[in-house]
């Protein structure tokens, strides 16, 4: 574990977690709880992670939330937890509650029409070897495992077609580890953090663990006293307070959270 922000003291943070009246632990999935895989359907969590999350949920001391760019219906089968936690999918466009209640934020008719148009690009991207992922409010183009020439072809193809739609087309361009996503403007993981922090109220201790550029919105939205944790094997510039390398340091962080949060019960 490496402290990135000189003003952040991990020991003091966990002491506050021990004394807090409520706690919220937000976790990204791909690249954070699970290593990346060429086939996303095979991106299973690191060994030991799911049993720890089961323990945290069973203890009842923490509101556990998965915050992912995936469509929730594609993520639930991979979790294999005893109880499905609260999940925010598609970068905040979807919310699946622990009791199964499901909501999707309203997407404008104009944006939906543009997404239908973008669907027409899929065959060309697949010819270059790419994979396309539809989700509420967006369309992701994946190139993990492809060579540089294929990646360049996909990026160029999507960029040219996106530009043809014109500025102000309501689809924002986002780079992520292993591809690009065109997503309806207006929501990101930072909005999820702000919503959950508001629901938790004053006195709550909050942590967010993520690996990708899309998690930076969440890191920056955290209130003072929270922990923004970058989880990835290689370091990159970030707004996070801590950098931990999975799986060993990820397991250590979750174990310490569970131990400290449970001390005051």
Regions found by a protein language model. Name each.
Residues 133-209, 213-222, 226, 231:
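Conserved acidic, metal-coordinating active-site core of Asp-based
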Residues 1-7, 20, 190-265:
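Mg2+-dependent phosphoryl-transfer enzymes with acidic/Ser/Thr/Gly-rich catalytic loops
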Residues 32, 72, 214:
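Conserved Rossmann-like nucleotide-cofactor binding loop
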Residues 61, 84, 129, 168-170, ...:
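A generic structural signal for alpha->beta connector loops
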Residues 33-43, 177-185:
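Glycine-rich phosphate-binding "P-loop"
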Residues 44-135:
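Active-site phosphate-binding/coordination module
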Residues 24-26, 86, 207:
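Hydrophobic "anchor" residues on beta-strands that sit immediately upstream
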Residues 1-29, 33-37, 41, 48, ...:
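Non-catalytic pre-domain segments flanking phosphatase-related domains
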